[in-house]
Each structure stands twice: as structure tokens, then as C-alpha cells.
Regions:
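Conserved donor-binding/catalytic core segment of Leloir-type glycosyltransferases
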Residues: 184-200, 206-209, 222-224
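Nucleotide-activated donor-binding/catalytic signature segment of Leloir-type glycosyltransferases, i.e.
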Residues: 234-262, 266
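Short hydrophobic beta-strand element within catalytic cores of glycosyltransferases
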Residues: 297-298, 302-305
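Carbohydrate-associated surface elements
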Residues: 145, 167, 227
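A short, well-ordered alpha-helix in the C-terminal region of glycosyltransferases
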Residues: 330, 337, 344-358
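A short helix/loop element that forms part of the nucleotide-sugar donor recognition site in Leloir-type
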Residues: 172-184, 189
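Glycan-recognition and catalytic cores of secretory/periplasmic carbohydrate-active enzymes
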Residues: 219-220, 248, 370, 376-758
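Conserved acidic donor-binding segment of nucleotide-sugar-dependent glycosyltransferases
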Residues: 317, 321-328, 337-342
């Protein structure tokens, strides 16, 4: 039997990785059925690791196409079954949704180990975990509480769930030899190990120590573990520094040792064998599985713990002691009692040792092997496959290389000669606003550090170009001279769009506060916008703002007023055969229905919704032909009752169509819009009137469009940003298409929108 495993894997420092490696090797080394293993390892934040030979492929957590390449590899590998190690945070997308397309394409039985099960999940988390359980042949959990949650909260059939305890290494050291090695002969060792973060409650133990040392001055508390990588990424060593200050203030330097190390299991078990009492002082009950608790009991430690779920379940029948959350006084009483009564301490250690003998990895691995043998012996009932309207494998790898080429410390250069920045043309507000939108989307979806690096560059350009009255200049020369006093209404609207998106998706408070300042300084100008595209862009920005600030009734009123202006333009210009806002189809056409679709979602207005869908259908009729997109040419546009221009075709028009169909899909869940979205995107890659790709696979930029003679090879900011925003939108739509319908829209909301269209 050949098995595939999906999860993190050493040398990546991660508890799930250690679990995956131990499980895989224990099943292989048992020699009872498993003859070959292969691992698909999860990488984080573009990190590469020197994996051992059993790792055949790695997945970049935020790269959706990696998941599809991995499932193709698994399906062709000859593996008989797949084991998925599921933990929130190791799979990409909102709530870890990127794993779903892989599971939907998997052609072999799936066994999923759930390391975390949330009692109060978000809508996304609940729906995604339910879908994973639906796709799994068996689900392994490590506590009875987990079974209760799965059945009661996630509605998983109980017969699908199997309880297999967390495994522990079958490693043993002589206690006295270990104490001698660590020079602990005269000390009473208290120990906590694992990744460090504020939720671990280390300060509870430190605050309890003065009362313990008063009676047991030989006590030593060792905290063994690095700061959790996610904590380190966002807060640095803030928590460890806080602990060090606390230790110093309580004069505990001789009694507390913080070891900032991630050690191997042999070394860890030496510490566990040497310790007198193991402590898990976690601050929250919401931990359904604790690998550190299992390891401590497997090593025969006397465990003292707060009553989080796993501890409350395991530390019964004198296998340990419990104390209340954040209760330093209670902890000191328990520890003093045990240190003063060695016979009680020894009795707990004996019970823990007895339990630990049943959860060694060889025994746990055999349970998994037996489970898979049972699954393979039964005929697999195929689940219905979802139609894959979007194929991410057709997309080039997402890259910011050309954007980096165009960006300096002032902003993004607006034009290019072929793939080289044209410094003579300087900068413009339009493109820096588009660039801000794009990097916000990129960081939200891919956590790309380069996007985070560029974000303040584009935001500071926008701030610099704002006038005292809240309007904006547009053009800036390369030597930083202003070239106009007031920019176009289009550029104003695009800036509000980007700022509105930022306010709902800012990666930190500094960028949020800057964006908020610029946004609200511009608000007094909203009522004076005349151009319909300036209005549309502004409406989109307001809609994004309102999604996270729904109580701002004044801004809702402004959005309604602007939407009514577009609706009024529609009523003034439409005829039986011309369902549009003007007497011509010009440029960036899709943003007009797009703006109304956004407003329809936020305002729940039937008149706005009807005009949005009617005009979208009209635009579709005149731009979708023979299953590809043909955007309106800008030579003479398409004037009512005249011939439409075929050239020049520009990327911003295709981008607007992608965004328009995406918002229609979000509102309705109608997969026909998903198909049209992908068709519109493929315009960039050669499914167009010229049958030529505008995307340059060498420079990673996008050409400026089609002329009647062929491709305009210049690759300016507008075109490349239009491509990247479209690319990100396709990936977002693909992600949404694999979420349950209830994630995208409730049945009631879908029904309401359908009624609004009627």
C-alpha cells in the first residue's frame, strides 16, 4: 500500500509537521501494509526548505495553482489513499479554502486528521470544514469533545468519525541521568515547552513562582520554545520581552530560564524525563488537541494544567491536576502541594506513564493503517464533481516583476517603451491608485511581502497629490514637478475606489489611518462629480468602505444619490434597442454596470439592480461573440446606429468586464457569470480578435492593447495593472466557486436579488 500525506513537514518548524512525519514513518516502519510513503509539504510565505526524500512536491500556501499541480501528481502517483493533516492557518485563502479544489479533484480515498475544531466558527470556517468532512472517507479526531463538536455543530455523521489519540515518540531516558546532564540534581524542575505566544499564559506561572520559591527555593521554571512564527511575523519578540521584564521585576532571574530553541524530539524527551512537573497554563479553554500535553503524558510527567478542553478530558482519574485560567494563586497552591508530597507526585507520574504506553507512535500508526485498510476494503461511492468553469492552470504564474521594474520611491511610472519604464512621461494619479488597489488585493490574497513593500509608496503618492480642498492633482514629472492643478474626475474616482478598498482591507493601522484621512478629505467633492465614469469609480470605493462601515448612513445616502445619477443617465439614453447610459459605448464600459452592482448589494435597491443587470446584458450582447471577448475600439467608439470601432482595444476594458461579471456572480451565484468572467480574462492570453496574447511571459508585463496593425508592444502601468487586477479577480472567483453556496450568499439574499432582476 502506497500512501500520500498532505501537511507541513520538517525541517519547517511546525507542530503539524512533526506530527505528519511521525505518523508517516510509524506507518511505514510497522511493516504491516504500508510499503511506500510520499509527502506533499506545505510551504509558508514563499519559504523553501531542504526536505527529506519522501517529500515529492511542495505547495506554496498562497499559490492556488500549486494545489492543482499537487492533486494531479497524487492522482498519477499510484497512491492508494491520501491522509490530510488539517489545521487552520496552513492552507491558503480565506479560512483555508484553497485546499478544497485539491480535494474535489482527488481520485483516491481521503482520511483527514482534524487538529483544531472550533466551537464558534465563522461562516467560512464552518462551511469549509463541513466540505472537507463531506469529501473525507473517514475523519480522525483526538478527543471525545471533538466528536461532540463535529456531530453537533458541523452535522458530520458520527459513523464517519474515528477517535485516535495523539501519538508520542517511544523514547525513554533515565531520569537521574537526564537531571545530571542538565545539572539539575538539587533543583525542582518545572517545565513548559512549545511555541510561545500570548495565549500560552506563561506569565501565570511566573507570577505564581514567588509563593513557590518561598517554600521551595530550589524551584526552577524552564520555558522551552521559540516564539510562534506567526506571532514573530506580526509582533516580533514583544511577548518574550514582556516575560523577561516580568521576571526581572519579580527578581526571578535565578528561577526562570527562557530557552529560545526548537529542539529535536530526543533532546525534548530528555527535558521531559528530567522535569518534576510539567505545566500548560493556557489562557483559553478552546484547545481541542494539545500535542505538548500528549508528549508530557507520554513521557510520564506529572501535568498541572488549566482546564482547556483536551486537558480537562485527559487529566482525570489522577492523571494530573487542574487549576483555573489566569489563577496564579491557585497554581502556586497546587504546585506547593505536589512538591511537598512526593508520594502524590509519584502517583500522578505512574498514571501518566500507564496512559502514555498506549499512545506511542507505533501503536497509533497501526491504528491509522487498520483504518485505511478498512476504507480500501469498501467500494468508494463517488461524490458529484463540481464543474470547473475556471482553470487556474491556464493562468501564468502571478508575478510583480514588471510592477517592481516600473516602481521607484515616488510611485509607479505611467508609461513604458516596450518593457522599459519611460521616465520622460513621469507619474499619474490614475496608475498609482490602480497600483494601490492591486497591491492591497495581492497582499490580501497572497500575503506577498513585495505587495506590502509597495503599498506605502503608492499611498504616499496619492497623499502627496491631494489638494487642500480634497481634490487631487494627476500628473507629476520624473523630477517631481506638478504638471496640473486638478486631475480628471476619472482619476479622482479611481483614487476613491482604491482608498475604499484599502479601508476594508488595510494590513495595519498606519495604512488604514492614512487612507481614512485622504478618503474623508475628498468626501466634500463627491457631490460635484459630473462624469459618469468618475461617479462609477467613486461609487465602487464608497461600496467597499460601507462593507466594513455599514452604520454610516450619511455615506449610504451619498452612494444612493450617485447611483440615482447613473440610473437617470440610463433612463435619458435608453431605447428599445439601446440599453445604455450614453448614446455611445466608449471606454471602461464595464465599470458602469459594475458600480450599480456594488450599490445594489450594499443598498438592496431593486431599481438600481434592474438597471445594472439590463445594461450588463446589453454590454455582453455587443462584446461577447463566438465565445470570446471583443472590446469596443477607441478610434471612434461605438455610436448608436453606427458601426462600432474594432481598434484600438485596451486592457482596461477587459479588466472592467472581468470585475463586472465577478460582482454579478457574487450577487447571484450564477455560474454563467463565472464562465463569462473567465472568458473575459482569457482576452489577455490570446482569446481575442487578434488571437494574440497581450501578456508578455518574458517581462511579466502586459502590452498596451491591439492596434489595427497588431499588438502595441509598450507595457505601461495601466495595462499591466489591468492584467494583474483581472488575474487576482479570477483567482478570487475560483476560490469562491469552491465554497458552499451559503458562503457566497444566503438563500434569502439570492432570492432577493433574483426578485430585484424580475
Amino acid at each position: 500500500m502506497k500512501l500520500a500525506y498532505i501537511g507541513t513537514y520538517p525541517p519547517r518548524e511546525c507542530g503539524i509537521g512533526t506530527f505528519t512525519q511521525n505518523l508517516a514513518h510509524s506507518m511505514l516502519e510497522n511493516g504491516k501494509g504500508v510499503k511506500e510513503i510520499m509527502v506533499i509539504a506545505m510551504n509558508d510565505h514563499n519559504q523553501d526548505y531542504p526536505y527529506p526524500p519522501e517529500v515529492k512536491l511542495s505547495i506554496n500556501q498562497e499559490q492556488q495553482t500549486d494545489y492543482l499541480e499537487a492533486v494531479n501528481y497524487i492522482n498519477l502517483s499510484g497512491a492508494d489513499a491520501c491522509i490530510l493533516e488539517h489545521e487552520f492557518g496552513i492552507y491558503g485563502g480565506l479560512g483555508g479554502v484553497y485546499i478544497l479544489p485539491l480535494l474535489h479533484r482527488l481520485n483516491i480515498p481521503l482520511i483527514t486528521t482534524l487538529h483544531t475544531i472550533l466551537e464558534t466558527p465563522s461562516y467560512n470556517e464552518r462551511a469549509i470544514l463541513k466540505e472537507i468532512c463531506k469529501m473525507s472517507d473517514k475523519i480522525v479526531v483526538m478527543s471525545h469533545k471533538a466528536i461532540h463538536f463535529l456531530v453537533g455543530i458541523y452535522k458530520v455523521p458520527k459513523e464517519k468519525i474515528v477517535l485516535i489519540e495523539h501519538g508520542v515518540p517511544d523514547i525513554h531516558f533515565d531520569k537521574e541521568e537526564s537531571r545530571t546532564e542538565f545539572k539539575l540534581n538539587e533543583r525542582k524542575l518545572l517545565l513548559t515547552f512549545g511555541f510561545i505566544g500570548r495565549n500560552k499564559g506563561i506569565e501565570t506561572v511566573i507570577k505564581a513562582l514567588p509563593q513557590i520559591i518561598e517554600k521551595h527555593p530550589e524551584a526552577l521554571y524552564i520555558v522551552l520554545g521559540k516564539t510562534h512564527p506567526n506571532v514573530l511575523r506580526h509582533s516580533g519578540e514583544e511577548y518574550r520581552n514582556y516575560l523577561q521584564v516580568l521576571i526581572k521585576s519579580l527578581k526571578l532571574n535565578e528561577h526562570v530560564l527562557l530557552l529560545n530553541e526548537f529542539i529535536d524530539e530526543n533532546e525534548l524527551f530528555k527535558y521531559l524525563s528530567a522535569c518534576d512537573i510539567y505545566i500548560t497554563p493556557y489562557l483559553s479553554e478552546a484547545q481541542i488537541t494539545s500535542g505538548t500535553l500528549s508528549y508530557a503524558m507520554g513521557a510520564g510527567c506529572a501535568v498541572v494544567s488549566t482546564p482547556y478542553w483536551h486537558a480537562a478530558e485527559l487529566l482525570v482519574e489522577n492523571k494530573g491536576r487542574l487549576f483555573d485560567f489566569n489563577d496564579s494563586d491557585g497554581l502556586s497552591e497546587v504546585l506547593n502541594e505536589l512538591l511537598e508530597n512526593p508520594e502524590n507526585l509519584h502517583e500522578i507520574q505512574e498514571h501518566a506513564t500507564e496512559y502514555g504506553q498506549d499512545i506511542t507512535w507505533p501503536k497509533v500508526g497501526q491504528k491509522y493503517t487498520d483504518l485505511i485498510t478498512q476504507v480500501l476494503s469498501r467500494p468508494k461511492v463517488p461524490l458529484p464533481k463540481k464543474e470547473n468553469v475556471i482553470d487556474p492552470l491556464l493562468l501564468p504564474p502571478f508575478s510583480l516583476v514588471h510592477i517592481k521594474r516600473l516602481t521607484d520611491d515616488t510611485g509607479i511610472i505611467q508609461h513604458a517603451k516596450f518593457g522599459i519604464p519611460n521616465l520622460k512621461e513621469g507619474y499619474c494619479l490614475d496608475d498609482n491608485a490602480r497600483a494601490l488597489l492591486m497591491v492591497c488585493m495581492t497582499y490580501k490574497q497572497k500575503k506577498d511581502p513585495l505587495a506590502l513593500e509597495f503599498m506605502p509608496v503608492y499611498l504616499s503618492y496619492i497623499h502627496y497629490m491631494q489638494n487642500k480642498d480634497g481634490t487631487f492633482r494627476n500628473f507629476l514629472s520624473f523630477n517631481r514637478n506638478f504638471l496640473d492643478e486638478k486631475g480628471s474626475e476619472d482619476s479622482f474616482g479611481r483614487t476613491i475606489w482604491a482608498l475604499g478598498y484599502l479601508l476594508g482591507n488595510a494590513p495595519n493601522d498606519a495604512y488604514y489611518q492614512t487612507g481614512k484621512l485622504v478618503f474623508f478629505d475628498a468626501v466634500p467633492n463627491f457631490d460635484s462629480i459630473k462624469s459618469i465614469r468618475g461617479i462609477a469609480n467613486t461609487m465602487i470605493g464608497i461600496s467597499y468602505y460601507l462593507r466594513t462601515n455599514a452604520s454610516d448612513d450619511a455615506m449610504k445616502g451619498t452612494l444612493h444619490k450617485l447611483a440615482n445619477i447613473l440610473v437617470s443617465h440610463y433612463h435619458q439614453n435608453h431605447t428599445e434597442n439601446w440599453e445604455w447610459f450614453e448614446s455611445l459605448l466608449a471606454y471602461d464600459n464595464g465599470i458602469l454596470p459594475l458600480a450599480l452592482l456594488h450599490a445594489a448589494e450594499v443598498l438592496e435597491d431593486g431599481d438600481i439592480s434592474k438597471v445594472a443587470f439590463d445594461t450588463m446584458d446589453f454590454l455582453t450582447e455587443h462584446t461577447m461573440k463566438d465565445d470570446y471577448l471583443s472590446v469596443i475600439g477607441n478610434k471612434d467608439w461605438y455610436v448608436r446606429e453606427k458601426e462600432r470601432s474594432m481598434f484600438a482595444q485596451q486592457p482596461i476594458d477587459a479588466e472592467a468586464m472581468v470585475l463586472m461579471y465577478h460582482q454579478a456572480y457574487v450577487l447571484t451565484g450564477d455560474r454563467d457569470f463565472l464562465k463569462k468572467l473567465f472568458t473575459s480574462f482569457m482576452w489577455f492570453l490570446g482569446e481575442n480578435d487578434m488571437r494574440m496574447s497581450l501578456y508578455d511571459f518574458e517581462t511579466k508585463g502586459c502590452c498596451d492593447g491591439f492596434e489595427n496593425y497588431g499588438v502595441n508592444r509598450n507595457q505601461g502601468a495601466e495595462s499591466s495593472l489591468a492584467y494583474l487586477i483581472s488575474h487576482l479577480t479570477v483567482l478570487q472567483a475560483y476560490e469562491e466557486s469552491f465554497q458552499l453556496e451559503e458562503i457566497k450568499t444566503s438563500k434569502a439574499k439570492k432570492s432577493t436579488i433574483n426578485e430585484l432582476q424580475d
